């Protein structure tokens, strides 16, 4: 049955339509927020997937360019693979929903969001997140929601809920916040050095709005929600877990204690083999369940060390960071490089500087068309000791790259200050947790090594969490999580920033949400950590950005011309500018306001190109004398190119002081001659005189 539900959200109407579209899905809703329209669907398989030890959830966010009245570029003229923005949005939707599905559910669940219309002021990403939550909540798929979400801005110290496009442009932060009625389940933020306490206050205010949205969704579920289906639990049989725990508890406590990840992994592998062989006869044909019990025991032991004893499996205190080191200038030919190492996590970041014409062109549903600063993250198999080939970046790599990019963006100099396109690539060489935050630190080092005048160094670190499963009010937070703590812990709270404030946040959780106290402690820990890294590691490796750029980086020569002359400099079909580029080997970028940037590794070639551009853009006035080249001869005179791309006519009567019978008697094609501008007619044609120019020379 078709029904609609509406509420006011940030001064605009949010409307949910059910019972009309995509009725074969387990749950579907059409979300309208202003003129932004998104179809959200949730579908589950009837039976569990065989042979998996995880919950098989997939989330897609599909942009349709017709939503903004665009036809896709290229030859194919249809949408292809998801854009980077679509992948990042899918991850933002996935993270708050995944922890609220039953841990032992093994049925495939697919959430698909199709963007049908976008008005730019009302975020389709937010509409998709809300639509996904509602679609799952009203479906028969087991789910412990619902989840509400808002976007937070900050303008002149005031928190703005769901800012418009104009407000986003001047906002000091852009935070996607999701939560249930009592807890926060996801934070994704980019900010311009927002103090920790201001961010915490904004999260509190955002949660108050989320509670209203959750109440609204509960009302929808009450009216149209389906009963949840029964499913086959993938939980380890209690008998098997108890047997494994009794046999191997003390051995597991000993096995996990190691500073070195490889030593610990070998200990666990050896113990797993021993346990599996021991129980092969006791529980025949139950090897998968035995291995799941071993995993569960390892998790229990690691968490007990943290929660009960206040120590970690590598011997660190809860607030202790792994050994740190930083180096710059490792790679001789790149424009800038930095190596950041934290324990057994190691990231090598490299900077490449390019012309403004090298910016990334974006073809999506956003108004943003180009990107000048880019960060790419690579995670090869060898970084975790795996023998596998590289198949290009996946969703995780794209997400981690975007996080580090967002962290550095506020400190990147403006185009006016530093007119380069900047690309940073972070190569993960070793991974034992927090590689994205290692990429933030590596990027800072590489940018400073390249001579990019970043405003301040940025560091990143993460906080972890273990909550008592029997008493949710009892928990422990800790700093700088390693791989095993990320794997078995309840939270990965990543924060990057400068000494003065936060620039990026990304929070992943595995429980039903975070309380205000947990978030507060996480901010305190990460602030302490990032200040320590900036002062004691980054600034000791390189105290400030280099004054001199690499000799291999392109040099910039700039000039300013009259904007009305841009067309002349470019020439018909790009003829003039391409001629300059071909003759000098430079790259040229011309802004609409007349600013011209010339990029060249050869400074003399750059100066020559600048002279040619300035000559073309120069205003021509009667009386000026030029040394020109004859390019064409006719019966009535000679055409002379007196400036690059500019030519004029020397009439036969103006070739010499004596009478001239044939033009060829005086000049031929290719001759260089002095000419004087006599007049510029109404059509812009330039009349020249060799005779007058020669008389001026004789007078001297």
From Swiss-Prot:
GO terms for biological process: mRNA catabolic process; RNA processing. Its EC number is 2.7.7.8. It is found in: Cytoplasm. SUPFAM superfamilies: Eukaryotic type KH-domain (KH-domain type I) (SSF54791), Nucleic acid-binding proteins (SSF50249), Polynucleotide phosphorylase/guanosine pentaphosphate synthase (PNPase/GPSI), domain 3 (SSF46915), Ribonuclease PH domain 2-like (SSF55666), Ribosomal protein S5 domain 2-like (SSF54211). It catalyses: RNA(n+1) + phosphate = RNA(n) + a ribonucleoside 5'-diphosphate. It comes from the Bacteria. One of its GO terms (cellular component) is cytosol. Keywords: Cytoplasm, Magnesium, Metal-binding, Nucleotidyltransferase, RNA-binding, Transferase. Mg(2+) binds at residues 486, 492. Residues 623-691 form the S1 motif domain. It is an enzyme of class 2 (transferase). CDD domains: KH-I_PNPase (cd02393), RNase_PH_PNPase_1 (cd11363), RNase_PH_PNPase_2 (cd11364), S1_PNPase (cd04472). Residues 554-613 form the KH domain. PANTHER family: POLYRIBONUCLEOTIDE NUCLEOTIDYLTRANSFERASE, POLYRIBONUCLEOTIDE NUCLEOTIDYLTRANSFERASE 1, MITOCHONDRIAL. Involved in mRNA degradation. Catalyzes the phosphorolysis of single-stranded polyribonucleotides processively in the 3'- to 5'-direction. Belongs to the polyribonucleotide nucleotidyltransferase family. This is Polyribonucleotide nucleotidyltransferase. It comes from Acetivibrio thermocellus (strain ATCC 27405 / DSM 1237 / JCM 9322 / NBRC 103400 / NCIMB 10682 / NRRL B-4536 / VPI 7372). The lineage of its organism: Bacteria, Bacillati, Bacillota, Clostridia, Eubacteriales. The gene is pnp.
